[in-house]
């Protein structure tokens, strides 16, 4: 079978490294051993390429322990692609889910490839040489190094997949409804009927645009004549024929396939089945194509009339209808594009993949995203944060609403993902283009200080107000001739950008003003310079042909001020991201928390969700530097009185089944219980209302000083964890909690609290510090330990400099969400 053929294809050296002895064939006993798994103590993953096995990874638990032996065997033809490392990720995740905390492996000293697998995975490997054999062992807990290594490999693989699509050496244009080959680089070959006119136009555009690679135009049969490893295949034709064409693309090891044709839901699913089974990367269905204006690439595979100008702005649109308008407007305003991708509704390649590519693309200074209604992928936050740390990313997202005018949960989550990733959210294409135009010609502002200069006091004052409304700090407004007012603005060290106001009539600014502004921008490259014509229709930019210096021109000062303000905010995000990054809060012992949760999970089955009792809650919270207000669990009135005497009166009495929104004995929560008699009477009323099952166990808790009730809930329903903050206790039912996502850095926690109802009650930012710290710590805890499904702290009493957790619910279980599909690039 598969394993036998796989084994017999490998070199004697590879077989020796795997089995420590020559073994040209596997025995029946060995085959039976290698194919027997129980999905718990014996687990194996295989990698398939078409119908052939190209890799095997397996673990086998040492009986009665939480340690397993791990082994890999990768096809000789696929060494060096990272396959073993990716399979180790899957094995480790499966092992952790099954209660295995440690892997061991044995290898020969000269098997450097296997040693490299463990090192590149980020694990701290202990090794020992014994009798010519290296014994390796490492802990499976996902440390920061392991997580960082996984993220790094994922981003590199994503970028590599996109690179073959946007920087191809070979392109095939395939009409799924035609047959036969025709090479545009060999005009002597007999042409065949090509029904799709767009493909013919693409072939002509690639030829006319000096694409340096080879281009083949034809039907599906043309794929059979292509050399293996064609970089980009663009397909159009009947949707029903697409799965077969994609299979042929996979036969030729195509790097990426762009599907121009529309497809309904069932047809898209059939297409995706081939993509997943064959390991293809797909753009579409319904894409309008891609382009790369780098002269060395010269890829224009867009099915629209307009052609992009070369430049430094990356563009992604999830709406095919918008692409043509985007290109038309970009040409009209002189906006140069580095790469443009039309994804339609992304089925495979998506915004996260593109951001991973743009994060390392030297030609791209800024990225403009037009996002449709599809939910953002789980990888978006990490990919966008990586890109936003080095360049500006702005996004126009769908504003569709559900009935009642409220955003859906998915939309709330997507907005949080945009906010926390450093992406600039905009509300219109005009705002999106304003940011792109500014960054295409000028550096982003180095701060919020702005000087406004012009010849009209009224116009300057209007622009000063517009800049202030955009969140900028107008340093001064200079009125006078351009050279003098510009010189005055440059002399102020707090000025980071300059807005020049032109109120002269006519289709063009005065020559002396143009010369002064362009000369000033050339002499002060550290400043961001823009010009506003105060309502007059003028050219979109001023350009000095001799020096290449360009200054964007905006119709209204509000447009210029708004773009500058948003870019200043993005700069501040980058600064805080460099300082804080995704660092773990001080006092959070990640290893200790993971060890605790793994030990407790052993009490239940692999699919069971456990609710932690009070003692375990306190242990877990203590490991992350948090404490619950002093409390005791009791089962009798006598124990409750004794606990209250120990804690100190007055106390709160809480039944197991309690309504946090109400605070009466009948609802299971009684406050300010002042003595033994009061406690006994309260206990009796509570037990009568709830019954014995609703009572036990009962919590006796010290009363904390009065303050604001806050609620924090962190959940991991799938691969995207959410963080909610709002008012707690009785007010929780009336307060729409503010939403964030994991990972949540300290600045993100601060912004989340500031955007919630908590900030309206705690108006002084200093009084929010304990809430921000608590939210940050709880979010870091859940993000670090994927077995924690939910933490709900409600109410948290904020009194002065302290945030007291008075009630908490914690659920743990197997990690949620399927392992993501990984691509090797």
Model-inferred region functions:
Residues 1-163, 168, 525:
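Long, contiguous binding/interaction regions
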């Amino acid at each position: 079978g598969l394993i036998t053929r796989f084994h017999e294809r490998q070199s004697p050296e590879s077989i020796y490294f795997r089995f420590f002895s020559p073994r040209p064939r596997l025995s029946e006993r060995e085959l039976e051993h290698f194919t027997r798994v129980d999905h718990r103590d014996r687990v194996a993953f295989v990698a398939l390429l078409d119908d052939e096995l190209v890799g095997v990874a397996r673990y086998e638990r040492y009986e009665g322990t939480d340690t397993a032996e791990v082994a890999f065997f990768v096809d000789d033809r696929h060494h060096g692609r990272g396959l073993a490392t990716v399979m180790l990720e899957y094995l480790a995740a499966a092992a952790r889910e099954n209660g295995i905390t440690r892997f061991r492996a044995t290898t020969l000293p000269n098997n450097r490839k296997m040693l490299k697998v463990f090192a590149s995975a980020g694990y701290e490997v202990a090794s020992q040489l014994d009798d010519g054999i290296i014994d390796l062992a490492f802990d499976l807990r996902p440390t920061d190094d392991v997580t960082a290594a996984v993220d790094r490999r994922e981003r590199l693989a994503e970028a590599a997949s996109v690179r073959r699509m946007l920087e191809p050496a070979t392109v095939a244009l395939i009409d799924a409804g035609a047959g036969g080959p025709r090479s545009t680089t060999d005009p002597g070959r007999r042409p065949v009927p090509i029904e799709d006119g767009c493909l013919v136009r693409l072939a002509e555009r690639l030829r006319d645009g000096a694409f340096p690679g080879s281009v083949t135009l034809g039907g599906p049969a043309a794929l059979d004549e292509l050399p293996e490893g064609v970089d980009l295949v663009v397909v159009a034709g009947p949707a029903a024929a697409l799965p077969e064409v994609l299979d042929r693309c996979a036969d030729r090891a195509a790097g990426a396939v762009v599907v121009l044709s529309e497809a309904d839901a069932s047809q898209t699913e059939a297409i995706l089945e081939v993509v997943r089974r064959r390991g293809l990367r797909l753009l579409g269905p319904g894409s309008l194509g891609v382009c790369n204006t780098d002269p060395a690439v010269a890829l224009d595979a867009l099915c629209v009339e307009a052609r992009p100008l070369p430049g430094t702005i990356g563009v992604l649109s999830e709406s095919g209808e918008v692409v043509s308008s985007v290109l038309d407007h970009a040409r009209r305003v002189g906006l140069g594009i580095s790469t443009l991708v039309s994804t339609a509704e992304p089925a495979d390649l998506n915004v996260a993949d593109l951001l991973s590519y743009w994060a390392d693309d030297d030609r791209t200074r800024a990225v403009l995203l037009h996002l449709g209604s599809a939910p953002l992928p789980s990888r978006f936050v990490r990919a966008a944060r990586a890109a936003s740390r080095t360049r500006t990313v702005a996004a126009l997202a769908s504003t569709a609403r559900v009935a009642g005018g409220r955003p859906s949960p998915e939309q709330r989550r997507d907005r949080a993902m945009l906010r926390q990733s450093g992406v600039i959210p905009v509300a219109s294409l005009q705002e999106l283009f304003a940011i792109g135009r500014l960054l295409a010609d000028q550096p982003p502002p180095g701060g919020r200080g702005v000087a406004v200069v012009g010849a009209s006091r009224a116009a300057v004052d209007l622009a000063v107000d517009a800049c202030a409304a955009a969140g900028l700090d107008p340093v001064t407004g200079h009125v006078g001739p351009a050279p003098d007012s510009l010189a005055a603005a440059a002399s102020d060290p707090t000025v980071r950008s300059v807005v020049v106001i032109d109120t002269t009539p006519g289709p063009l600014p005065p020559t002396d003003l143009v010369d002064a502004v362009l000369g000033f921008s050339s002499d002060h490259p550290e400043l961001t310079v823009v010009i506003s014509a105060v309502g007059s229709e003028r050219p979109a930019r001023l350009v000095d042909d001799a020096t290449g210096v360009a200054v964007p021109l905006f119709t209204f000062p509000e447009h210029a001020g708004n773009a500058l303000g948003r870019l200043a905010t993005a700069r501040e995000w980058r600064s805080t991201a460099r300082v804080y990054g995704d660092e773990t809060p001080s006092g959070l012992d990640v290893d200790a928390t993971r060890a605790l949760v793994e030990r407790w999970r052993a009490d239940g089955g692999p699919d069971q969700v456990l609710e932690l009792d009070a003692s375990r809650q306190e242990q877990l919270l203590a490991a992350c530097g948090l404490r619950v207000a002093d409390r005791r669990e009791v089962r009798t009135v006598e124990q409750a009185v004794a606990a209250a005497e120990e804690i100190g009166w007055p106390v709160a009495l809480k039944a197991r089944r309690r309504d946090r929104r109400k605070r009466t004995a009948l609802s299971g929560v009684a406050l300010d219980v002042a003595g033994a008699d009061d406690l006994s009477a309260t206990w009796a009323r509570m037990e009568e209302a709830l019954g014995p099952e609703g009572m036990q166990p009962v919590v006796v808790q010290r009363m904390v000083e009065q303050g604001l009730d806050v609620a924090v809930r962190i959940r991991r329903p799938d691969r995207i964890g959410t963080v909610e903050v709002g008012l707690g206790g009785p007010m929780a039912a009336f307060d729409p909690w503010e939403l964030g996502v994991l990972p949540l850095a300290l600045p993100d926690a601060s912004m989340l609290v500031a955007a919630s109802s908590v900030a309206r009650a705690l108006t002084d930012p200093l009084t929010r510090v304990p809430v921000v710290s608590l939210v940050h710590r709880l979010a870091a805890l859940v993000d670090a330990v994927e077995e924690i499904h939910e933490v709900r702290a409600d109410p948290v009493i904020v009194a002065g400099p302290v945030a007291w957790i008075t009630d908490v619910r914690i659920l743990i279980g197997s990690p949620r969400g399927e392992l993501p599909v990984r691509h090797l690039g």
